[in-house]
């Protein structure tokens, strides 16, 4: 049932128009074609806009539809007239038949009564033995039955004749006086071929039946909606209800009409829209959009959002908001444009103005104004046909002019320059210029400094219509106040408490480390993410427990597999392993905390109950299922209570924010933990695991890292800058790699630049990027891009003396100010990098030191050589470069003693590679000494030693593995005997050693 009370005023207007059209056509029913015409007559109806959006001319379509319906109505009138005449004739004939049938039925009634009388008399005669009377009565009865059969045959003949015209059940009802003549004729009309034909055309059958019935019976039908239109309106009601709308809008009626493909209105609209293919899409939403005014379609009412409390509070920015108000109150040039870096709060200023307008905290001239935020992307999206974008924008501006109290806010206002400007079209800026010049519209814009310069300033006609308001980044104190104002919103959203120290951390840490973004945006993001992470940590299961649960699940699958294979021994082992993991999980749950443990346990119980409920339902045990559901409900209630208790305890701290900032930048900014403190104190020992000797170098590097991690480094300079001098192969590059591995867990995290690649003056472009107009400008520089991606890193400038002097000039500001500007004008932050430069300058003086001398002589000679090296360094590098380096470290040449230690490190690396095969090698002292002797060269350092091990250990070992002499799992001892290296399995070597010692003991005894 449809209720007109549910329809909006505009919907009722269209329905009234449809009724008017039906009356003009002398129709007694309002059908879908009348509704279609009513919607098409209004150029602003959702249906008219919808078809025009698809490139269909509304007026042309309306004309074609009207002509088609006019011709159809003429044909229908003729068909109705003919059908009515046929039915009138049929009615006359039926009336005659009915009269004859009446006579026959009267005769039959008389015969029936006579038969009843004879049967009574016959029974009486037989009872009293009057056989003569009985025979006479029987003869009379037979004559009556013969007459009755004859009359019934006549009736059957009439029934057969009527059945050729009417339905048999209708004829039967008619003959039994259950159906009148008019009823029979109406039944015939409903089942006539004419009605079937109009159904195919999509015309509601009751509309034609009413017209024919009026002519046949002379009774005027009631004026109402047709069956088909009633169905369409019911569908529209359903759509409105499903969308939660209080009233049925024209968009719902239009969508229901388009979807009613069996009606004449639906058929006509679907034919022009492209039929089934087009209608696969849901058009309701699109029609709903077409129903809105241009402002509602392409804009958001900020005043309305402010009334609903959906805008964040705006703290501070008094100067900028007042400046915007002043410009809006001007007589001319009253269009402010907010210019500032991304993230400084330009949009927030406009939202603050909207809140002031709603709260009546503005001058009277602005109190009735509405601020609408316009989405340029929505204006452009879907404008497939030429002129469609201009039409949308023009309609929007016309509505703004008509309303008179609208201020448009266009975020990223530079997008209006060139927007929609296809071949032969005018862009949005040029469409808006005349209205801006005449003061017909007021616009607030927002854009960045670069884009203002690039787009707005390039167009003087557009620029002079706007008055810029420059928005600076707020100070740390102002940002703290902003975050305190936002705190209630964030706490309510995340269900956590945010401490003052977390707010302070968000501002200070992002200010210092997130240099590529602006306050307050970056501070808000850091605090928001920290709150989200805090909530997730408590609600989610800890990663360690998740990992154990994964292992338990995998073991369960293996247990089932072992059971199926009949491997019961393996099954038992797996069960023991599973029990250990379960115990470990329980211990971890206990460590996590009582509440977390209870929450995890409850969740597990609920999961188990779900399985049991499912099993009970499958078995049909409804009583057990109900019991389990009650138990589950209790557990869920308890779980909810525990989670609420836990959320009350959640407080976002400094460390939470620091963790987020560390993740963003890769810089460790969280407070030092006990474990990390111990690691930093033992940094020298860790570095010495890879670098032999060079105590002074290792100590200098470790101290620089400790200063940075303790927060004592100069915040305007890199963590440390070193120049490593010394001959090749003494550990300069190795120390850099070891440092990178300690800091990042991987020596590949080192940003390494071989300075021999930068011999030419123009190779500076490789480091900071090619200048504009040159090939590779878009790619950026090797150094600047690497540091932008990893601001916390170790930069190794290998063989620095081989670079062009002009390339070294580039590093002056890096070493002093910790910053470098790339070819795109972006400032890259080097304040969290360790810069290590290596060089071989003056290494000839170091090689002259007698390495076999005693330690005192060695140290004295080293100091003399060191002075000469530093003197020579001054000849290669300018004083301003040397002066900016934190520490110049001269590496000592390696002695035989150090090389022996290096062999141990190199063999350890070989064992790491062999670990996959479970093979291990050990060197005897004789083998070690011989390798040092063969691999020692003071001029080349430790590198020849690596080649010696490769030649005398790795190559023979590989041959023996391939031949099968050394198998997986073996430990091999490498010894030096009789001028060659021998490889002996450890068991055999131990046996030989024992035999030798035994024989030597015997000799002693003898």
Swiss-Prot record:
One annotated Gene Ontology cellular component of this protein: cytoplasm
Positions of region (NBD1): 251-473
Region (Repeat 2): 225-289
InterPro entries named among the record's database cross-references: AAA+_ATPase (IPR003593), ATPase_AAA_core (IPR003959), Clp_ATPase_C (IPR019489), Clp_N_dom_sf (IPR036628), Clp_R_dom (IPR004176), ClpA/B (IPR001270), ClpA/B_CS1 (IPR018368), ClpA/B_CS2 (IPR028299)
Keyword Nucleus listed: no
Main subcellular localisation: cytoplasm
Clp R domain: residues covered: 3-289
Regions that span the bilayer: none
Entry note about domains: The Clp repeat (R) domain probably functions as a substrate-discriminating domain, recruiting aggregated proteins to the ClpB hexamer and/or stabilizing bound proteins. The NBD2 domain is responsible for oligomerization, whereas the NBD1 domain stabilizes the hexamer probably in an ATP-dependent manner. The movement of the coiled-coil domain is essential for ClpB ability to rescue proteins from an aggregated state, probably by pulling apart large aggregated proteins, which are bound between the coiled-coils motifs of adjacent ClpB subunits in the functional hexamer.
UniProt family annotation: Belongs to the ClpA/ClpB family.
Protein name (database record): Chaperone protein ClpB
Organism in which the protein naturally occurs: Aquifex aeolicus (strain VF5)
């Amino acid at each position: 049932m449809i209720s007109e009370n549910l329809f909006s005023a505009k919907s009722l207007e269209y329905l009234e128009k449809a009724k008017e059209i039906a009356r003009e056509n002398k129709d007694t029913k309002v059908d879908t074609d009348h509704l279609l015409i009513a919607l098409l007559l209004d150029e602003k109806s959702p249906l008219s806009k919808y078809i025009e959006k698809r490139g269909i001319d509304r007026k042309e379509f309306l004309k074609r539809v009207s002509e088609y319906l006019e011709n159809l109505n003429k044909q229908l009138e003729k068909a109705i007239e003919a059908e009515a005449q046929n039915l009138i004739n049929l009615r006359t004939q039926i009336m005659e038949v009915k009269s004859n049938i009446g006579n026959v039925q009267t005769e039959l009634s008389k015969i029936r009564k006579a038969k009843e009388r004879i049967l009574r008399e016959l029974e009486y005669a037989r009872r009293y033995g009057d056989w003569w009377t009985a025979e006479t009565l029987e003869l009379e009865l037979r004559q009556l039955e013969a007459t009755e059969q004859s009359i019934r045959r006549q009736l059957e003949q009439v029934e057969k004749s009527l059945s050729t015209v009417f339905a048999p059940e209708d004829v039967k009802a008619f003959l039994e006086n259950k159906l009148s003549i008019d009823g029979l004729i109406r039944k015939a009309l409903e089942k006539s071929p004419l009605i079937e034909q109009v159904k195919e055309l999509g015309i509601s059958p009751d509309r034609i039946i009413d017209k024919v019935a009026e002519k046949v019976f002379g009774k005027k039908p009631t004026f109402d909606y047709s069956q088909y239109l009633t169905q369409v309106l019911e569908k529209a009601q359903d759509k409105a209800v499903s969308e939660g709308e209080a009233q049925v809008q024209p968009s719902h009626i239009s969508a229901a009409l388009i979807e009613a493909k069996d009606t004449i209105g639906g058929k006509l609209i679907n034919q022009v829209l492209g039929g089934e293919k087009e209608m696969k899409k849901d058009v309701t939403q699109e029609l709903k959009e077409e129903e809105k005014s241009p402002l509602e379609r392409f804009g958001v009412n900020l005043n309305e959002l402010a009334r609903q409390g959906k805008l964040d509070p705006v703290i501070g920015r008094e100067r900028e908001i007042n400046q915007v108000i002043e410009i809006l109150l001007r007589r001319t040039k009253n269009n402010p444009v907010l210019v500032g870096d991304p993230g400084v709060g330009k949009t927030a200023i406009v939202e603050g103005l909207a809140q002031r307008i709603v709260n009546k905290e503005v001058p009277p001239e602005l109190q009735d104004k509405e601020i609408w935020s316009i989405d340029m992307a929505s204006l452009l999206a879907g404008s497939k046909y030429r002129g469609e974008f201009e039409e949308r924008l023009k309609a929007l501006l016309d509505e703004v002019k008509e309303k008179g109290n609208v201020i448009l806010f266009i975020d990223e206002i530079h997008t209006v320059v060139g927007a929609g400007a296809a071949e032969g079209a005018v862009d949005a800026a040029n469409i808006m210029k005349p209205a801006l010049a005449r003061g017909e519209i007021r616009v607030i814009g927002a854009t960045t400094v670069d884009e203002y310069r690039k787009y707005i300033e390039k167009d003087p006609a557009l620029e002079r219509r706007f008055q810029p308001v420059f928005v600076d980044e707020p100070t740390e104190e102002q940002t703290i106040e902003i975050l305190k104002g936002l705190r209630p919103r964030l706490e309510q959203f995340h269900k956590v408490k945010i401490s003052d120290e977390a707010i302070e951390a968000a501002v200070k840490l992002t200010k210092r480390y997130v240099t590529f973004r602006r306050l307050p945006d970056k501070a808000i993001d850091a605090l928001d993410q920290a709150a989200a992470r805090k909530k997730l940590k408590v609600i989610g299961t800890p990663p360690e427990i998740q990992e154990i649960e994964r292992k338990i699940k995998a073991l369960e699958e293996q247990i089932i597999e072992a059971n199926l294979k009949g491997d019961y021994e393996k099954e038992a082992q797996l069960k023991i392993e599973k029990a250990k993991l379960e115990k470990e999980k329980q211990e971890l749950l206990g460590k996590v905390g009582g509440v977390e443990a209870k929450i995890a346990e409850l969740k597990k119980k609920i999961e188990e109950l779900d399985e049991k409920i499912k099993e009970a339902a499958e078995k049909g045990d409804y009583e057990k299922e109900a019991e389990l559901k009650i138990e589950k409900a209790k557990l869920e209630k308890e779980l909810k209570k525990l989670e609420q208790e836990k959320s009350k305890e959640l407080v976002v701290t400094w460390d939470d924010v620091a963790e987020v900032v560390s993740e963003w930048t890769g810089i460790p900014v969280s407070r030092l933990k006990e474990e990390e403190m111990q690691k930093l104190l033992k940094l020298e020992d860790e570095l010495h695991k890879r670098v032999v000797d060079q105590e002074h170098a290792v100590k200098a590097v470790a101290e620089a890292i400790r200063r940075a991690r303790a927060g004592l480094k100069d915040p305007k300079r890199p963590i440390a800058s070193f120049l490593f001098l010394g001959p090749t192969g003494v550990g300069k590059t190795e120390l850099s790699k070891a440092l990178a591995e300690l800091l990042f867990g991987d020596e590949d995290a080192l940003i390494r630049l071989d300075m021999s690649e930068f011999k030419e003056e123009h190779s500076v472009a490789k480091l900071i990027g090619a200048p504009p107009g040159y090939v590779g400008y878009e790619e950026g520089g090797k150094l600047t891009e690497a540091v932008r991606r990893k601001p916390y890193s170790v930069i190794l400038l290998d063989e620095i003396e081989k670079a062009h002097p002009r390339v070294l000039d580039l590093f002056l500001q890096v070493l002093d100010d910790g910053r470098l500007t790339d070819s795109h004008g972006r400032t890259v932050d080097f304040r969290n990098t360790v810069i290590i430069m290596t060089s071989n300058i003056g290494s000839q003086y170091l090689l002259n030191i007698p390495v076999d001398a005693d330690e005192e002589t060695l140290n004295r000679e080293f100091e003399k050589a060191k002075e000469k090296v530093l003197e020579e360094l001054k000849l290669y590098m300018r004083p301003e470069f040397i002066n900016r380096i934190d520490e110049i470290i001269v590496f000592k040449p390696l002695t035989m003693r150090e090389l022996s230690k290096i062999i141990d490190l190199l063999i350890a690396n070989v064992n790491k590679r062999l670990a996959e095969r479970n093979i291990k090698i050990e060197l005897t002292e004789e083998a070690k000494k011989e390798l040092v002797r063969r691999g020692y060269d003071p001029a080349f350092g430790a590198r020849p030693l690596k080649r010696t091990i490769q030649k005398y250990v790795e190559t023979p070992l590989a041959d023996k593995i391939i031949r099968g002499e050394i198998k997986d799992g073996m430990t091999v001892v490498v010894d030096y005997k009789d001028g060659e290296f021998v490889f002996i399995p450890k068991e055999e070597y131990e046996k030989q050693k024992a035999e030798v010692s035994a024989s030597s003991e015997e000799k002693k005894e003898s």
